Structures are given as C-alpha cells and as structure tokens.
Swiss-Prot record:
Gene3D superfamilies: lambda repressor-like DNA-binding domains (1.10.260.40). It comes from Pyrococcus abyssi (strain GE5 / Orsay). It comes from the Archaea. This is Putative HTH-type transcriptional regulatory protein PYRAB03670. The lineage of its organism: Archaea, Methanobacteriati, Methanobacteriota, Thermococci, Thermococcales. Residues 131-189 form the HTH cro/C1-type domain. Disulfide bonds: none annotated. The keyword DNA-binding applies.
Amino acid sequence: MEREEFVEFVERILRRIGFKTLKLNFRGGCFNLVATRSLLLLFIKALANIDKFSEEQAEDLKRLAKLFKASPILVGLRTKNYEMEDGIVYERFGIYAVTPGTLYSMFAEGEPPLIMAERGGFYVRIDGKRLKDLREKHGYSLSELANILGVSRKSLQRYEKGDSMVTLEVALRLEEVFDEALVKPINVLKAKFDEISLSSKPETTLEREVFERLERIGMEVVKVKTAPFNAITTEEEDNIELLTGIDEKKTEKTLRRAELVSQMAEIVGSEGMFVLKRARIEVVNKVPILPTRVLEEVRDADELLEIINELKEAKS
C-alpha cells in the first residue's frame, strides 16, 4: 500500500468510528492526521513501516501532544523486520504504535490491547495488588509462587509492586494457578512524555529574532521542527495558543503551509499566524501574514491577538 493510500485508509477508519479528521499532506511531518471525538484529540502519524518514524519526529509529536493535551499515536503495518499484529502494542521513542485493526477495536468495540511487544518477546502488565492478594489468600509464599512460575523471588516482588511487565508465558501461568484474569489493558492514549523538553532553541537568525520578540511581550515559544509551522506560541494567563510559521518571504510553500496551519488551528481550537521578514500585512487562508516590523511595535500578547482577530474579521 502506497504512503498516501495508507494515510487515507486510516482516515476512513477514524471517520467510520465517529471522529472528525484532518489530513495534512506535509512530507517529513511528525503527524499526518488530526482526529477529534468528544473531548478526545489525537495526533496521529500513519505510516506503513513504523521504523521510518524518527526520534526527532517523536520529540516534536510529544511536544505538540503535551501543549494541546492530546494523545499521540503511531499507526502502521510493519517494522523493518516483521509484520505488526492486531491486538499488540508496539513502541517507538516513547510513542505507542498499533495496527489499523487495533485502532478500530479500541474505539469501535471498546477493546483495548493487552499485549506489549518489547525486545525479547511479548509482555503484559498485571494487577500487582490483586496478585499479592491472591497469593496470600491461597497461602503461597513469595518463594513458593516464584518457583511455580519459574521466576526469581525478586521478579515476583516487582510484579506485585507493579514495577515490571510480565512475559506472556508467566501471565498465562498466573491465570492458570489462580483461575482469574490479572492482565491490565494498555492505555494507548497515554504516551510517555511527562519529561519532554519544551525547548525554544531557534534554528535560523530570523527565528531567533521572532522568538526573542515574542518572549519580550510575555509569550512562551516552543520550537517544532517537523510540522507545517515553526513553533507554538503560548500565553498561559489568557489561554492563547498560536501556530506560528516563520519565513523570509512569501512563496508558494508559505501559502501551502498557511493553508495547513489554518486547517489545523480550526480543528484544535487555536489561532495561526505567519511572520515574514519581507511582506505586506494580509490574511491568507484565514491566517494573518505579519511582517517582522509589526512584532517590533506590539506591546503585549493581548495586542498581538487583537491585531490577529481584527485582520481576520476584516478579511471575512
């Protein structure tokens, strides 16, 4: 299946199960689908081979997910070595990856996956507290149960504390011993990005100038490398979020990026703007284009947002 065909296939699945979707055709981007349903917001990278997903893309995807309180997910068909299986969760750089079939089961049938593919085999997470209660109820010591399972006493202690995943074989033995399900579902919507850096390091002289000016008016800037925009600009007190593009001058690529920013801003409930070194003030695809001199004259975040809203209203 070709890259574009696969993205469209995943988008059709999402729409079938009630999601509003946006497909972004931006080569090299950290995501190519945005999906919303009720209060749920997903940033999805759909690609047939999940090993083509880079660490840089993963870091950007985590930043976006953290800023927008969204869930990042990879959807794929294979790795470079093997086909992915339905019902199993894979991981790349801290982001969960599933097949289209697993995605459908999660949201259409309410069946979360239970098995995690890790180096060395398949693993599950078990209810450690329930395991300890059952062990004590049946009168097993740590050593006795560990011997039955074929694991060390220390490993069994980690299982009971919930500090370690369990091989599929051990989990099946546990359920045979106690005749009770102990496996906990994997929450694919909860990626591991608590410690992600919201860095604002600029890559160009123009980016540095724009970032510094935005920071001087009280805004925070988070650099994003693999998206249609260069940064997310925020102001927490007034809950301002701006998808911010930066270019030297207006080109066809700028216009295409502005269109994508406009579409994304609408679906995530934010605003967008482009700052160009050389440009006239205008609105393209509902996204204001501002020359850098405008930023130099702005006194605070509220005034910037006021300019953006006035330009959009004048255009409509």
